[in-house]
Amino acid sequence: MARVKRGNIARKRRNKILNLAKGFRGGNKNLFRTANQRVMKALCNAYRDRRRRKRDFRRLWISRINASARINGTNYSKLINGMKNSEIIINRKMLAQLALSDPKCFEKIVSSVSN
């Protein structure tokens, strides 16, 4: 039976982990065991936060819409309900952008919903 030498594969695997650990602090960037643990943790956090980012932005949009709606004499829930009843289809991202960049247009939307 022929002898199997695995040095290249093992080195490639370790270097892949150490390349992923670039930018980490201390031994976490150049000691394989700790780097491996840190990389696994970082990948878990990245996976979790990709899902969390969507929730966070939706919360931000809702709070911006609510703040602008209160300036115009209503609140978020009444505004969204009025938009559904009057069949105005604008998503929360666009509403928040309008509230920030074009307050006059947002004010017209609020007045058309409340009437």
UniProtKB/Swiss-Prot annotation:
Pfam families: Ribosomal_L20
Keywords noted in UniProt: Ribonucleoprotein, Ribosomal protein, RNA-binding, rRNA-binding
Keyword rRNA-binding: yes
GO cellular component, one term: ribonucleoprotein complex
Single GO term (MF): structural constituent of ribosome
CDD domains documented for this protein: Ribosomal_L20
GO biological process: ribosomal large subunit assembly; translation
Record's function text: Binds directly to 23S ribosomal RNA and is necessary for the in vitro assembly process of the 50S ribosomal subunit. It is not involved in the protein synthesizing functions of that subunit.
Family assignment from sequence similarity: Belongs to the bacterial ribosomal protein bL20 family.
Protein name, per record: Large ribosomal subunit protein bL20
Species lineage: Bacteria, Bacillati, Cyanobacteriota, Cyanophyceae, Synechococcales
